[in-house]
Amino acid sequence: MPKLKTKSGAKKRFIPKKSGKVKFRRAGVRHLATFGKTKKQKRHLRGTDHLAPMDAKKIKECFPYAR
């Protein structure tokens, strides 16, 4: 039986962790310095976050060899 392939779109956007959570980077960060974003918005866009459990379940299906 051939190896299962990981979805290339998912591997560019998500990182499955050993704890079972899925890490991702927030959208809207490409032009953080542009006008129209408040300090609070920029602060919340910084760093990474984890997906909700139901969304994480769907994304994990894209990673056949993730634990």
From Swiss-Prot:
GO terms for molecular function: structural constituent of ribosome. Keywords: Ribonucleoprotein, Ribosomal protein. Gene3D superfamilies: 4.10.410.60. PANTHER family: 54S RIBOSOMAL PROTEIN BL35M, LARGE RIBOSOMAL SUBUNIT PROTEIN BL35M. It comes from the Bacteria. One of its GO terms (biological process) is translation. It comes from Anaeromyxobacter sp. (strain Fw109-5). Signal peptide: none annotated. GO terms for cellular component: cytosolic large ribosomal subunit. Belongs to the bacterial ribosomal protein bL35 family. InterPro entries: Ribosomal_bL35, Ribosomal_bL35-like, Ribosomal_bL35_CS, Ribosomal_bL35_sf. This is Large ribosomal subunit protein bL35. NCBIfam families: rpmI_bact.
